[in-house]
Amino acid sequence: MQTNLLKPKAINVEPLSAAKGAHRAKVTLEPFERGYGHTLGNALRRVLLSSMVGYAPTEVTIAGVLHEYSAIDGVQEDVVHVMLNLKGVVFRLHNRDEVTLVLRKEGEGPVKAGDIQTPHDVEIINPDHVITHLSQGGKLDMQIKVEKGRGYVPGTMRRFGDEPTKSIGRIVLDASFSPVRRVSYTVESARVEQRTDLDKLVMEIETNGAITPEEAIRASAKILVEQLAVFAQLEGQINDIFDAQPAQRSTQFDPILLRPVDELELTVRSANCLKAENIYYIGDLIQRTETELLKTPNLGRKSLNEIKEVLASRGLTLGGRLENWPPQGLDKR
């Protein structure tokens, strides 16, 4: 009886239409054992929404303004609305954790995120985002502190370093650092060979553009692995889980890769062509590319398509790479 749990073989990322500046994608992973779609989908969703690192404005100083309930001469919106609009600006910092930026604008018209003066290692993802509007003769002089953080941090929880008191005119903002806007998931049915009781996990992820959905799901998976690693070895250092016996870990292959290609039930012509190239196991086959197979004598496009279809039915594709293949003791006929 088969006791090994299935691992997802097919991963597909499909970009979806989204609001301007946002990134949205559908990520599909299959197959999972029954129930694992909900188990992993819910865990990934919670991590994506709560634990992604991002950048947000945290403090603002405006010339002539003492507090957030002030009005600014020549500015159509009050300070509260200006702060709300400022939170909609998406920043990305490279090789730094915080920066203070300057925004100076005069004259009638809209003030946009692109008007903020930025150094070379600070990027504004949505430069057309409107922060406020100036009337004729209006002027805005603002300093914006942008920091790196995680999740949501209310302004009441923020401190001012070693300063004994708050500086007059410095406005502290509630900071939403998360670059992930929305996450949803569904679990559909999947099939592998004769098994139809498997799960397919479909996740829709929307970000603000500071990171892509693919980067977000990779980061969330890494967080989960690091958090769960402690349960894999209840004694010793967490790093030992990843560092100990790397050779042993790397030789654990999915059992399907150790099966002979004869079990794929290919046509006699295709099977003979593979054996002529010393391809005896499914693990040998998936490491070949389409180009390499087409160079095989007597193996044409029709045979190649047959091989690809048979592999796809088992959740496999060509062009893979397996470290430490073949495993020790595997019979090369």
Curated annotation (Swiss-Prot):
DNA-dependent RNA polymerase catalyzes the transcription of DNA into RNA using the four ribonucleoside triphosphates as substrates. GO terms for molecular function: DNA binding; DNA-directed RNA polymerase activity; protein dimerization activity. This is DNA-directed RNA polymerase subunit alpha. Its EC number is 2.7.7.6. Keywords: DNA-directed RNA polymerase, Nucleotidyltransferase, Transcription, Transferase. It is an enzyme of class 2 (transferase). Gene3D superfamilies: 5' to 3' exonuclease, C-terminal subdomain (1.10.150.20), DNA-directed RNA polymerase, insert domain (2.170.120.12), RNA polymerase, RBP11-like subunit (3.30.1360.10). It catalyses: RNA(n) + a ribonucleoside 5'-triphosphate = RNA(n+1) + diphosphate.
